[in-house]
Amino acid sequence: MGDVVAYSGSLRRLAVELGKVASDLRLLSMGPRAGLGEIALPTVQPGSSIMPGKANPSVPEMVNQVCFQVTGCDATVAAAAEAGQLELNVMMPVIAWNAIHASTILRQAMIVLRTRTADGIEANVERCRELLDKSSVVATALSPYIGYAAAAEIAKEALRTDRPIRAIVLERGLLDAGRLDTILSVEAMTQPGIPGRRKDE
């Protein structure tokens, strides 16, 4: 029984990870007006009857449901494996059915997620840039250059006035536009090290 329980547990673990991916896709695609809207998912069915223009994340929602079912199958396998006595377990039919069913539906869900969603994801570059520019977290990248206190003060002002951090830094003359662009570039902020600083510095 131990091998089947381990196999079923591995499916559950995969389902947890896959479910997280599906939930992240749902979150990142929320829109069109409210929500993050950082990505657009392929439309696989007509949109909402109460919200024209909305594309429902139908495939990620389906994947979440499959992952819940796989978790349930694993719970059944574990309970049935525990129900045996000594070297005999008459629960093998329900153990086998749930392990095979979980494997089958999880495999199909991954195929559908890839072919009907992942392969067609489009980044909303303008929206991503807008959210990055409005985020006060970019002040963290400025700290090595203007100091923590000044960066924190700028972040607070940006939140209070709903203005981009970049505009406030330029207005105060703390850094020139070229240097600021280098520090606040997406590439610089998503690489290891201090944004805008060369590796030999």
Please give the residue ranges for each predicted region:
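Conserved, well-structured ligand/cofactor-binding cores
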Residues: M1-E201
